[in-house]
Amino acid sequence: AAINDIIVPLMTEKHHSVNHVFAAHPELLPMSKSTFYKYIDLGILNVKNIDLQRKVRYRVKKEYDYTRAKTKDNGIKLGRFYRDFQDFLEHNPNASIVEMDTVIGTQGGKGGKCFLTLLFRFFNLMVIKVLPYRRSIHVTEVFEKLKESLGDEEFSRLFQIIITDNGSEFSDPESIEISTKTGEKLSSVFYCDPNSSWQKGCIEKNHQYIRYILPKGTSFAGISQQDADVIASHINSTPRLVLNNQSPYEAAIGFIGKDSMDLLGIQRIDNDDVDLSIRILNR
């Protein structure tokens, strides 16, 4: 009865995963996860397979042939290819890695409001910034604000390495890397090989959490930065199996620190208050 009364609503209404409810309520689930799934299949619980968070599969891509790199890549991307990223990591194995991407709403291309996502790879912690358009000037504006609020030293510590794709919105890496105050290089931007999104697979997988709240086809037109911070806070408060059932917030707080976490717009949400549905934007 307790499972149907407490656990099932968390899964069907707030989109909690099986791992999330097992991490948050072990006292109510005296069985293995495989048994829990079996109970669902047998119809013992008031939850159906369609209510479960989807599992995402990724294909392994073949290695990129750098000898075929387009001439235009040899400008801004010289020294920033994925192989350069790998070389940098060999010499800086403990560097903080941030994966960067964009998520669009109903309007594709550069035509409307979208999200800039920044994911701290070691912790699966995702920052979400609202862009009015998917253009490099607006990406630059986000990073100028981050440098201003965090300060150059803290920005450099947190964003030591940034790995992203070949989208035109990321075509001005120096504006991301360089301090607007001193001209000093604070970060290093690298690019994935073409058609190799798996090289920043952590952020690709984390985007599924955004889609639980804002399914594909949902307009971002009415989404404010405050809304994006709320979305990020709920996502980052969701326990992850890969983090030994810690949430990204719990895993990252020791490294990022409370002050910087606040400046990044992320707050901790209690386990049972985590809601991965659009209702969180109507509160």
Give the role of each language-model region.
Residues 1-205, 209-219, 223-224, 230-233, ...:
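Secondary-structure boundary/capping micro-motif
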